[in-house]
């Protein structure tokens, strides 16, 4: 069921109250009905659970907080204004008052709720793939489109390379060269043997990153290898023997800190990242090697398929654009057509 929409007047009042709470924090002011609460302070959301959020204060302490009903959305990584409570019923010890403007936000489409944010304020999106459950260039390309759309730098990480034979390693290196040639950084690592982990740690240092990718590619194992030894280990699931598909270990996005500097948001894995909320033009621009050819096709409404005079297809045929990327571009549109067909019923 769709949610009731606020009127324009209600939206203005909600926004005015939100701005007032941000301004009160800056002035150190408190409202009369907030006296049971402590002073407003800055915090960061480390995880979100329904109508509650875990908020970390400046000293690294974590408080489970209620959310003001006027907050439009709250996700892991959000910078917030919150107040600690004097009592702690049911483990709740504060309330989130307001959310600061986001520097960046990663989203995904939802059939019922439109576009939903996943996490905020990251400056690097780590696209984790692996040989098991399968090496999917399609999912890598989908996440690259998402990265280009939100203008956040991607890092492609191929895990479980300890499973490679010399012959299969050569084949995988050739596939990863597709991305290196167009300017993307690719790291090949193993959380089991430690191969490639030092350059990976260096790439995460001093940045706020988010782990994305398929279920079962080893994001939790990588996180365990990156966190200090004294940190509580993250639960790890294996690939299902029955389906051959990855199983979800992480169920909600959570923010972690590295002792060597930097922060990481671990997000739940997906089977396929939907992009049907994006316009066709934005998807085409999300394939960065297409950009110099966009607008140069013979026909303005070129679909970059079998259309005569298509500049992008010409670049594929000449070897300038990889046919694997071109095929995945069309797979995205095929899946969008299937989603739209289901939504029409």
UniProtKB/Swiss-Prot annotation:
Keywords: Cytoplasm, GTP-binding, Hydrolase, Metal-binding, Nucleotide-binding, Ribosome biogenesis, RNA-binding, rRNA-binding, Zinc
EC number: 3.6.1.-
Compartments, record wording: Cytoplasm
Gene3D superfamilies: Nucleic acid-binding proteins (2.40.50.140), P-loop containing nucleotide triphosphate hydrolases (3.40.50.300), Probable gtpase engc, domain 3 (1.10.40.50)
Protein name (database record): Small ribosomal subunit biogenesis GTPase RsgA
Residue ranges, compositional bias (Basic and acidic residues): 23-34
Needed cofactors: Zn(2+)
Segments of this protein annotated with the region Disordered: 1-36
Biological processes per GO annotation: ribosomal small subunit biogenesis
Record GO terms (molecular function): GTP binding; GTPase activity; metal ion binding; rRNA binding
Binding site for Zn(2+): 297, 302, 304, 310
Domain CP-type G: 103-273
Family of the protein in this entry: Belongs to the TRAFAC class YlqF/YawG GTPase family. RsgA subfamily.
Statement: the UniProt record of this protein carries the keyword rRNA-binding: yes
Description of how the protein assembles with itself and partners: Monomer. Associates with 30S ribosomal subunit, binds 16S rRNA.
Purpose: One of several proteins that assist in the late maturation steps of the functional core of the 30S ribosomal subunit. Helps release RbfA from mature subunits. May play a role in the assembly of ribosomal proteins into the subunit. Circularly permuted GTPase that catalyzes slow GTP hydrolysis, GTPase activity is stimulated by the 30S ribosomal subunit.
Binding site for GTP: 159-162, 213-221
One GO CC annotation: cytoplasm
Cofactor note: Binds 1 zinc ion per subunit.
Domain of life: Bacteria
One Pfam family matching this protein: RsgA_GTPase
Organism classification: Bacteria, Pseudomonadati, Pseudomonadota, Gammaproteobacteria, Enterobacterales
The keyword Nucleotide-binding is annotated on this UniProt entry: yes
């Amino acid at each position: 069921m769709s949610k009731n929409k606020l009127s324009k007047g209600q939206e203005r009042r909600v926004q005015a109250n939100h701005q007032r709470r941000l301004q009160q924090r800056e002035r150190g002011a408190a409202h009369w009905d907030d006296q049971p609460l402590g002073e407003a302070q800055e915090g960061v959301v480390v995880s979100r659970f329904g109508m509650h959020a875990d908020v970390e204060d400046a000293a690294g302490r974590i408080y489970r907080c209620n959310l003001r009903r006027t907050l439009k959305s709250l996700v892991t990584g959000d910078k917030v204004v919150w107040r600690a409570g004097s009592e702690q019923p049911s483990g709740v010890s504060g309330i989130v008052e307001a959310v600061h403007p986001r520097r960046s936000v990663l989203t995904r489409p939802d059939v019922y709720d439109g576009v939903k944010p996943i996490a905020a304020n990251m400056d690097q999106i780590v696209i984790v793939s692996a040989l098991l459950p399968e090496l999917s260039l399609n999912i890598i390309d989908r996440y690259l489109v998402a990265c280009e759309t939100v203008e956040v730098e991607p890092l492609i990480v191929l895990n479980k390379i300890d499973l490679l034979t010399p012959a299969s390693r050569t084949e995988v290196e050739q596939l990863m060269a597709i991305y290196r040639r167009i300017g993307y950084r690719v790291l090949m690592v193993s959380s089991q043997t430690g191969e490639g982990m030092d350059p990976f740690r260096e790439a995460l240092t001093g940045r706020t990153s988010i782990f994305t990718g398929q279920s079962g590619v080893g994001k939790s194992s990588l996180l365990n290898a990156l966190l200090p030894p004294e940190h509580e280990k993250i639960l790890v699931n294996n690939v299902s023997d029955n389906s051959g598909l990855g199983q979800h270990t992480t169920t909600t996005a959570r923010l972690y800190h590295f002792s060597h500097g930097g922060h990481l948001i671990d997000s739940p894995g997906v089977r396929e990242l939907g992009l049907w909320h994006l316009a066709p033009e934005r998807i085409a621009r999300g394939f960065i090697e297409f950009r110099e050819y966009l607008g140069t096709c013979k026909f303005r409404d070129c679909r970059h398929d079998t259309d005569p005079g298509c500049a992008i297809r010409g670049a594929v045929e000449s070897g300038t654009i990889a046919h694997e990327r071109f095929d995945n571009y069309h797979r995205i549109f095929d899946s969008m057509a299937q989603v739209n067909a289901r939504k029409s019923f």
